[in-house]
Amino acid sequence: MSFIINILSTPAILVGLISLFGLILQKKPVEDVVKGTVKTIVGFLVLTAGSSFLQTGPLNDFGVIFNYAFNMQGVVPNNEAIVSLGLADFASDTAYIMCIGMIANIVLARFSRLHYIFLTGHHTLYMSAMLAIILNVGNLTGPMLWISGGLILGLIMVISPALCQPTMEKITGTDELGFGHFGGFGYWFSAQIGKLFKDKSKSTEDVNFPQRISFLRDTTVAIGLTMTIFFVVVTFVAVVVRDGMSDPTISAFFKGETQTHWIVWAITKGLSFAGGVYIILSGVRLIIGEIVPAFRGIAEKIVPNAKPAIDCPVVFPYAPNAVLMGFLVSFLGGIVGLFVLGGINKALIPVALILPGVIPHFFCGATAGVFANAEGGLKGCLVGSFLHGLLITFLPAICMPVMGSLNFANCTFSDADFSITGIILGNIAQFVKGGGLFAVCVVLFLLPIIYNVIMPKKKEA
């Protein structure tokens, strides 16, 4: 079982197998099968390497130095942290839910009108862990827990891409690609905000730079310079303003950097950030070039009209300027949201202070920027990303009492779909227990299939 879970939770291998299967179904020559499979796996490994480099390097370091510079105390939403705690007690339940959920995803894609195959393995694992934790509180154990969790997981794996699909088609210019990332509600929300500015704002990618700064149209250069400025300013506040320049190196914050002057460190980290984004974009281009053609084989043979739903960086190459703007403005929204929560805490009721985590605001905020830009251009991008930053600050705060009641105090999920699922299902599980909760999960899963059977389909013109 552990071997199977390792495969299903490793996106590169999972998507490589999907590509292999699709190419074989199309009866492609052996050389094409090998080439397509290997390039798909390599593409995901490149994407993962870029994401990991950002998360463990520049993004993590920026979060540490930012929190110290501005003396912030609170909860930083982090999917990996809370999942690691959950797996300590619910590892087997998580594994079974994940396997059943992926089967349920295929069933819904085949027999409902939500033709999406969710391929973001690590998010599937995270959602499985959360469902295992919450449903356990609803007095479900063993097979009833696994089936209930698997059915809800399969349902979320088609609903989230379906929410994003109308805007996804505008971003990519094709209906062959879905979007698979459990921040879907947040991206849909940003897109709806963007629509308020439709036909009133030019795209972020149409921003005209003066000739002397035309180099900013190069994504790598623009991101590198912007993040270098951010790192220099924040590190200056931490080292010079707060510590009084007692030590010009960065050793007080990062022990391995004992000989590095803070200015050199800040510049290096800012440019490293741009390098990580460049790696991600390179991986995305490799994946898209191979997975979409290969997936047609599966769509034609098993799930007609199925779309592969792929992780959020898949949209980054379509609007690089929106990626940077979305991240920065979403992060600003997170800071504003923190002060709003602080005000609520003092004036009304005690509520968790949610610190703006750099990782969710980069990946989710950047994606929200791309979605909002597709619907409302530059103005839509700025407003949609800012409100998205507020959203992923307030939702985890609302979800905190649920997680606290499950003995996961001081931890919460970061992305919108996790928070919404936790809030809704967590509250249901507090009141509906055992067989009743199992029945609720089964009915929810069957609704898209029932709708497909009883409701007339639109006739093609």
Pin down the residues of each PLM region.
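Membrane-helix interface and helix-disruption motif detector
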Residues: I82-F90, Y116-I117, G138-W146, L216, ...
